[in-house]
């Protein structure tokens, strides 16, 4: 990542996509980052966008939904969330949008899907929740929750900030309409990465310059992107590929290789943590959550 960032600043620090060598290379490196990360996450290249941070990306999305929704329609958020995926949505209450809170069980920190079902009705347009809570470490069943929301006619926005560092997920298989995470917490530069599925991205109002309205990955980037940091994000794919090759995983980049590294990281984390869990699980003065 650092080598790519340094090379961009030293050799490519020009406006990308112009008809001369340095500019063409600059654009190619930005495209490389987007296409390789999208392939790992099982989505189309155009469905992956970059922005300054996950919080900033969510604020842009909230503005799009503010224009898209009618007063009286509802958004479901949780009290288990990273602030980036709750604060921007809650502020839409000032615009007449109803905010419904899917609350955790205070004894376990768990989000019960039965409680979600009681909140869902024809007025709910969006359900927001974390893939993994940054407070209690709870892993939420994204596919199951997404299916419930979709059956009720709602879209789904998943905050993956606390999950992605443990292995990039296959968003295409999980099924949410939006998936957000932070590159700088996932072996990358200071960027927010946002997957928006094509169907929803086309429905939401354009938030970018009018001349970018027809390009999905530009529609939710209001300002000029950080060219160098986007290009450097390809280093995240380099790292995943290097891990796969070192541990005998798939040679070809893409979702299969990403899944191998995801499972590799998960197994290593479990092995490291299990002795601690074994030590504390029988203690009367410690209660495990998540």
Regions found by a protein language model. Name each.
Residues 1-290:
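Pyridoxal 5′-phosphate
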């Amino acid at each position: 990542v650092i080598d790519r960032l340094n090379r961009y600043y030293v050799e490519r620090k020009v406006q990308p996509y112009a008809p001369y060598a340095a500019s063409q290379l600059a654009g190619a490196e930005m495209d490389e980052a987007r296409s390789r990360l999208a392939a790992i996450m099982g989505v189309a290249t155009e469905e992956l966008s970059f922005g300054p941070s996950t919080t900033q990306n969510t604020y842009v999305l909230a503005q799009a939904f503010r224009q898209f929704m009618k007063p009286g329609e509802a958004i479901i958020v949780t009290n288990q969330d990273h602030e980036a995926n709750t604060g921007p949505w809650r502020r839409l209450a000032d615009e007449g949008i109803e905010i419904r809170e899917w609350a955790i069980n205070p004894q376990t920190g768990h989000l019960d899907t039965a409680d979600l079902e009681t909140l869902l009705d024809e007025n709910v347009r969006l359900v927001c929740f974390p893939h993994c809570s940054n407070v209690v470490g709870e892993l939420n069943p994204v596919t199951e929750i997404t299916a419930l929301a979709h059956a009720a006619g709602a879209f789904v926005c998943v905050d993956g900030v606390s999950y992605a560092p443990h292995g990039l997920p296959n968003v295409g298989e999980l099924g949410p309409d939006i998936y957000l995470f932070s590159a700088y917490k996932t072996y990358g530069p200071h960027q927010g990465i946002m997957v928006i599925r094509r169907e929803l991205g086309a429905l939401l109002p354009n938030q970018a310059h009018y001349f970018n309205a027809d390009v999905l990955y530009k529609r939710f980037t209001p300002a000029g992107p950080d060219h160098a940091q986007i290009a450097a994000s390809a280093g995240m794919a380099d790292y995943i590929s290097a891990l796969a090759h070192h541990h005998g995983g798939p040679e070809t980049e893409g979702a299969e290789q990403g899944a191998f590294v995801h499972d590799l990281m998960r197994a290593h984390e479990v092995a490291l943590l299990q002795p601690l869990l074994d030590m504390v699980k029988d203690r009367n003065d410690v209660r495990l959550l998540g």
